[in-house]
C-alpha cells in the first residue's frame, strides 16, 4: 500500500492528471458530468445541478476549462486541493452559462465527456498537448500544468512548515502536511468510520470495500484502482526512477519515496510513538513499531503457526519451510531466498557499510543493524519479559533471559541434560561440548564459539567502545564491562574476602583476589613455565615469547605488550591531557589517574600500615610501603639480578640496559631514563621557564612546582604533625618529619647496614662507599659528595659569612648559627632515651648512643677504606695518637694536621646527620 503516500506531493497529482487521457479507454472516470448540464440555463438562471457536482480525480482539468466558459469567472469560488483532488464549486446566482452548439458530424454527441472547450467537442482535442517543457520535452494540455511541472526541475520550495521546517512546492502540499502535526483527519469512510488526512487517501481506502480494480498491468497482470497507481507500478518493470535526490543522487520511482528518503538528510522524524516517544521518518515505520508495544503479530505462517509483526519477516521465515534459495552469491556460492538478502550479503565481500550512526560514527552493512545499534545510545528496550517485566534492547536478549524462569524448556542437551527455551540457544550451548569455534577474527585469527563473542573481540582492534558510563564518561567494549565499572560509582561490593575483608563487586573478582592469599597460580606458560594468578596476566606474558605488541603509540609508533604500558609511555609525549584537576590544574591522560590524584586534596587515606600506622590512598601503595619494613624486593632485573621494591623502579632501571631514554629535553635535545631526571636537568637551562612567580620573579618549568613554591610566600603549611604541632608545606615533608618521633629509618645501606629516614640521605651516604663526588667546585676543582657540602666550601672562596652571632662569630648558614647559639642558651634538645643525658647537636647524641649499644665508633681503618687519604690519625700541636702516646711535630706540620682533622670532622658530621 505504499502508493497511498503518493498523494503527499502536488507533483504526483499533476502526474496523475497528465496520464488520464491515455487511460480513458481502459479506466473509466471516477467522476464526470454531461455537457447537457451546461445547456440548462441560457439566460442567467441558476444552475441547480452545478453545486452538486463533485469532480473527482480525473476532473481537475475540466474545472479549469469550466472557469473559462463562465462569463463572470471572478464570482466563482474555487477550492482546489491538489493533494485531496476534491473540487467543489459554488457559483453565484448571476452566473451565465454558454450554449455549446453541436456539430452535425460529431459521433461523440450524447456521450459522457470530461472537457468542454468552446464550440469544439472535447473528444476531438483530448490528445492535443500544446504546452511543452524545455527541460525534459514533456507536453501538457494546459499552461498551468506546465508551470506546476517546471517546479520539479527548479527544485523551488517556497512553502515552509513552522513546526518541522519541512519545505513544499505548493501551499496545498503544506496544508496537507500540517495535518501530520495537528492530527486532523477530515475525510472519514462512511463504511467503516476510518479517517484520513487527504481525500485521495480516502478514495484509495474505499477501493478496499468495493474491490474494484479496473486498471490492469500488461506485464504481470496485477490490477489497480487507478491509472496513476498503474503508471507508478509500471516503473517496476521499466526500471524508471525519475525522482532523484539532490543530496546524494539516489533515484526513486515516485515522489513519496524521494520525500521519505530526504528525511535521512534533514533528520526530520514527524511520526512519534505515543507510548515510548520514539520518532520515525515515515508512518509505516511507526505502524510496525507500535506492534512491539501492542504485541500484535498479524502475519502468521500457515505451515507452523508462528506469527510475525511484518510481512517481510514472515516471507523470510517461510523460506525455511520451502528450502528454495534461487539467489546465489558468485563470490562464496552462498544461496538466498530473496534478491534483497543476496544484495545485503554481498556487502560482506565489498566491505561497504553505508549506514552510519550519527551519535558515534559506527557504520553498518544494513539499516536493521543501525536501528538495533542506536538502542545503545537511546536506552530503548522494546522487548519486555511477560513474566517479570524486565526489558531488553534485543529480542535475543529477551530469549536468553526467559531461560532463567522455571517452566518447560523444549530443547534439551543430550550431553549434559541442560534445557533451553529455543533451539538456537541449544545449538550455541552444544559448541561447549564439541569444542567447535566457528567464528574467526579476520585480524588476529582468534576463534570464538558464538558471533557475539567475536563482535566484542573485534572492538579491541577497531577501538570502538559503544558502552559509555553516564557518570564519568568512561567507555567500554561490552555491556558487562560497563556494568562492572558502574559498581565503582554505586559503591556496591557484596563479595567479601574472608582473609582480609576486602570487598568486590563480583564473585569472579573475589575468586581472583583470593589467589593472592592462597598463592595459587593456575595459569602456567607453556614456553617457560612461569605461572600467573589470572588468565589476563598469562596472555600479556605470552606476548614476550610471541613478540606481539598490539598496543601502539600513535605519536611515535612505539608498540607495547599491554595497555597499561602504553598509557605509561604516553605521558612522555606532551600531548593532550583532557582530565584536569580543578584544585591544582594538573592534567592527566586518563580519568582514573585524575581520580587517584584527587585523593591527595581530599586527604582520604583509608589504608593504614599496622607497623608504623602510616596511611595511604590505595592498597597498592600500602603493599609497596610494607616492603620497607619487610625489606622485600620482589622485582628482579633479568639482566643484572638487581632487585627492587616496586615494578616502576625496575622499569626505570631496565632502561640502563636497553639504552632507552624516553624523556627528552625540548631545549637542548638531551634525553633521560626518568621524568625526574629530566626535570632536574631542565633547571640548568636559564631563561627557559614558562611559569614565573609574581611575588619574587622566580621561574619554574611546570605550574605544579610554581603552585608549590607560592606556599613559601603565603606561609601556607596545611600539613600538621599531631605529635609536636609542627606544620609543613607538603605531605612528603610531614611524612619525613614523623620519622623523628617514630624513630623509623626504613632506608638501609647494603654496605654497612646504616639506616636513614629518607632515600636522599641513603643516596648521599652510599657515595662514601663508592668514592663518588659529583659536586665539583668551579674555583679550585675540589669535589664533594653532597650539594650542601659544596655550598659550604664555596663560602671559603667568597669569604662571606652572612649569619652573625652576638659573640661576634660568623657562619655561612642559618642552621649552623642555630646550632652554635645552643652553646650560649644551654639548650640541649637531643636526649638519650636510655640514660637521660642531653646534647646540643644530634651527632653527639648518635655518638653517645653507641656506648649503650656497644657499637664501635667509626674506626680509622674504615675511614681509610673510604677516603684512601690517611694512614693514621694525627692530632695537632702535640696531640695524642690513637694509642694515647704523645706526639711532637713542627708547627707547620701541626697546622697541616689540624686542616686534615677538620676535613675528617666535616665528613663525620655529614655522615652522622644522614
Swiss-Prot record:
A zinc finger (C2H2-type) spans 131-153, 159-181, 187-209, 215-237, 243-265, 271-293, 299-321, 327-349, 355-377, 383-405, 411-433, 439-461, 467-489, 495-517, 523-545, 551-573, 579-601, 607-629, 635-657, 663-685, 691-713, 719-741, 747-769, 775-797, 803-824, 830-852. One of its GO terms (molecular function) is zinc ion binding. SMART domains: ZnF_C2H2. Expressed in skeletal and cardiac muscle. It is found in: Nucleus. It comes from the Eukaryota. PROSITE patterns: ZINC_FINGER_C2H2_1, ZINC_FINGER_C2H2_2. One of its GO terms (cellular component) is nucleus. Keywords: Isopeptide bond, Metal-binding, Nucleus, Phosphoprotein, Repeat, Transcription, Transcription regulation, Ubl conjugation, Zinc, Zinc-finger. Residues 1-35, 80-101 are annotated as: Disordered. Residues 90-101 have a biased composition (Polar residues). There is a cross-link at residues 5, 57, 60, 77, 87, 577, 738, 872 (Glycyl lysine isopeptide (Lys-Gly) (interchain with G-Cter in SUMO2)). The modification Phosphoserine is found at residue 881. PANTHER family: AA987161 PROTEIN, ZINC FINGER PROTEIN. This is Zinc finger protein 62.
Amino acid at each position: 500500500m505504499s502508493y497511498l503516500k503518493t498523494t503527499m506531493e502536488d507533483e504526483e497529482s499533476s502526474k496523475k492528471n497528465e496520464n488520464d487521457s491515455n487511460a480513458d479507454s481502459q479506466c473509466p472516470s471516477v467522476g464526470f458530468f454531461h455537457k447537457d448540464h451546461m445547456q440548462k440555463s441560457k439566460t442567467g438562471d441558476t444552475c441547480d445541478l452545478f453545486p452538486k457536482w463533485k469532480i473527482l480525480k480525473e476532473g481537475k482539468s475540466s474545472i479549469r476549462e469550466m472557469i473559462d466558459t463562465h462569463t463572470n469567472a471572478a464570482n466563482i469560488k474555487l477550492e482546489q486541493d491538489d493533494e485531496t483532488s476534491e473540487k467543489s464549486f459554488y457559483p453565484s446566482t448571476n452566473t451565465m452559462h454558454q450554449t455549446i452548439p453541436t456539430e452535425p458530424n460529431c459521433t461523440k454527441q450524447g456521450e459522457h465527456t470530461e472537457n468542454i472547450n468552446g464550440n469544439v467537442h472535447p473528444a476531438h482535442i483530448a490528445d492535443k498537448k500544446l504546452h511543452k517543457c524545455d527541460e525534459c520535452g514533456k507536453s501538457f494540455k494546459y499552461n498551468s500544468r506546465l508551470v506546476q511541472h517546471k517546479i520539479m526541475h527548479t527544485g523551488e520550495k517556497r512553502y515552509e512548515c513552522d513546526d518541522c521546517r519541512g519545505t513544499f512546492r505548493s501551499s496545498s502540499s503544506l496544508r496537507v502536511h500540517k495535518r501530520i502535526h495537528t492530527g486532523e483527519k477530515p475525510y472519514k469512510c462512511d463504511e467503516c468510520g476510518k479517517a484520513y488526512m487527504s481525500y485521495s487517501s480516502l478514495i484509495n481506502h474505499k477501493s478496499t470495500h468495493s474491490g474494484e480494480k479496473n486498471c490492469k498491468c500488461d506485464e504481470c497482470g496485477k490490477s489497480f484502482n487507478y491509472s496513476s497507481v498503474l503508471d507508478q507500478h509500471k516503473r517496476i518493470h521499466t526500471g524508471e526512477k525519475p525522482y532523484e535526490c539532490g543530496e546524494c543522487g539516489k533515484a526513486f520511482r515516485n515522489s513519496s519515496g524521494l520525500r521519505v528518503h530526504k528525511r535521512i538528510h534533514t533528520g526530520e522524524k514527524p511520526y512519534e510513538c505515543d507510548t515510548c516517544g520514539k520518532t520515525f521518518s515515515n508512518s509505516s515505520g511507526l505502524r510496525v513499531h507500535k506492534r512491539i508495544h501492542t504485541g500484535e503479530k498479524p502475519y502468521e505462517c500457515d505451515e507452523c503457526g508462528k506469527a510475525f509483526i511484518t510481512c517481510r519477516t514472515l516471507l523470510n521465515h517461510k523460506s525455511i519451510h520451502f528450502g528454495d534459495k534461487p539467489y546465489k552469491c558468485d563470490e562464496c556460492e552462498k544461496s538466498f531466498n530473496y534478491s534483497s538478502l543476496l544484495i545485503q550479503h554481498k556487502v560482506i565481500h565489498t566491505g561497504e557499510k553505508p549506514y552510519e550512526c550519527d551519535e558515534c560514527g559506527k557504520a553498518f552493512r544494513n539499516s536493521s543493524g543501525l536501528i538495533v545499534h542506536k538502542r545503545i545510545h537511546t536506552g530503548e528496550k522494546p522487548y519486555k519479559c511477560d513474566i517479570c517485566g524486565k526489558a531488553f534492547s534485543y529480542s535475543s536478549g529477551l530469549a536468553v533471559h526467559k531461560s532463567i524462569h522455571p517452566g518447560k524448556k523444549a530443547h534439551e542437551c543430550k550431553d549434559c541434560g541442560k534445557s533451553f527455551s529455543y533451539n538456537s540457544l541449544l545449538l550455541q550451548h552444544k559448541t561447549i561440548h564439541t569444542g567447535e569455534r566457528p567464528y574467526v577474527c579476520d585480524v588476529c585469527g582468534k576463534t570464538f564459539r558464538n558471533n557475539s563473542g567475536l563482535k566484542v573481540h573485534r572492538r579491541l582492534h577497531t577501538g570502538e567502545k559503544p558502552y559509555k558510563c553516564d557518570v564519568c564518561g568512561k567507555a567500554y567494549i561490552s555491556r558487562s564491562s560497563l556494568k562492572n565499572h558502574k559498581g565503582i560509582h554505586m559503591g556496591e561490593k557484596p563479595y567479601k574476602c574472608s582473609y582480609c575483608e576486602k570487598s568486590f563487586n563480583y564473585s569472579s573478582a573475589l575468586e581472583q583476589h583470593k589467589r593472592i592469599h592462597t598463592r595459587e597460580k593456575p595459569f602456567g606458560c607453556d614456553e617457560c613455565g612461569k605461572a600467573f594468578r589470572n588468565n589476563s596476566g598469562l596472555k600479556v606474558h605470552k606476548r614476550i615469547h610471541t613478540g606481539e605488541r598490539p598496543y601502539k603509540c600513535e605519536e611515535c609508533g612505539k608498540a607495547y605488550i599491554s595497555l597499561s604500558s602504553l598509557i605509561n609511555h604516553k605521558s612522555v609525549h606532551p600531548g593532550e591531557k583532557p582530565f584536569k584537576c580543578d584544585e591544582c590544574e594538573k592534567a592527566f591522560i586518563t580519568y582514573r589517574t585524575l581520580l587517584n590524584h584527587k585523593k591527595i586534596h581530599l586527604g582520604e587515606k583509608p589504608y593504614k600500615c599496622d607497623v608504623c600506622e602510616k596511611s595511604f590512598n590505595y592498597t597498592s601503595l600500602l603493599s609497596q610501603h610494607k616492603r620497607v619494613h619487610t625489606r622485600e624486593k620482589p622485582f628482579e632485573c633479568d639482566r643484572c639480578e638487581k632487585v627492587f621494591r616496586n615494578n616502576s623502579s625496575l622499569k626505570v632501571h631496565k632502561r640502563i640496559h636497553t639504552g632507552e631514554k624516553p624523556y627528552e629535553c625540548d631545549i637542548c635535545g638531551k634525553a633521560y631514563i626518568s621524568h625526574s631526571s629530566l626535570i632536574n636537568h631542565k633547571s640548568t637551562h636559564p631563561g627557559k621557564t614558562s611559569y614565573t612567580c609574581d611575588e619574587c620573579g622566580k621561574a619554574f618549568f611546570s605550574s605544579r612546582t610554581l603552585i608549590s613554591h607560592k606556599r613559601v610566600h603565603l606561609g601556607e603549611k596545611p600539613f600538621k604533625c599531631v605529635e609536636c604541632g609542627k606544620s609543613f608545606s607538603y605531605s612528603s615533608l610531614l611524612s619525613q618529619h614523623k620519622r623523628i618521633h617514630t624513630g623509623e629509618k626504613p632506608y638501609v645501606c647494603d654496605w654497612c647496614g646504616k639506616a636513614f629516614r629518607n632515600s636522599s640521605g641513603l643516596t648521599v651516604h652510599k657515595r662514601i662507599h663508592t668514592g663518588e663526588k659529583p659536586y665539583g667546585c668551579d674555583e679550585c676543582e675540589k669535589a664533594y659528595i653532597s650539594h650542601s657540602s659544596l655550598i659550604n666550601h664555596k663560602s671559603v672562596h667568597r669569604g662571606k659569612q652572612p649569619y652573625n652571632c652576638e659573640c661576634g662569630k660568623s657562619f655561612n648558614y642559618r642552621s649552623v648559627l642555630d646550632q652554635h647559639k645552643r652553646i650560649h642558651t644551654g639548650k640541649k634538645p637531643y636526649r638519650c632515651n636510655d640514660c637521660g643525658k642531653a646534647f646540643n647537636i644530634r651527632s653527639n647524641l648518635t655518638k653517645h648512643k653507641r656506648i649503650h649499644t656497644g657499637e664501635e665508633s667509626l674506626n680509622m681503618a674504615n675511614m681509610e677504606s673510604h677516603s684512601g687519604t690517611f694512614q693514621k690519625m694525627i692530632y695537632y700541636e702535640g696531640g695524642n695518637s690513637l694509642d694515647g702516646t704523645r706526639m711532637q711535630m713542627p708547627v707547620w706540620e701541626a697546622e697541616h694536621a689540624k686542616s686534615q682533622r677538620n676535613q675528617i670532622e666535616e665528613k663525620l658530621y655529614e655522615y652522622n646527620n644522614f
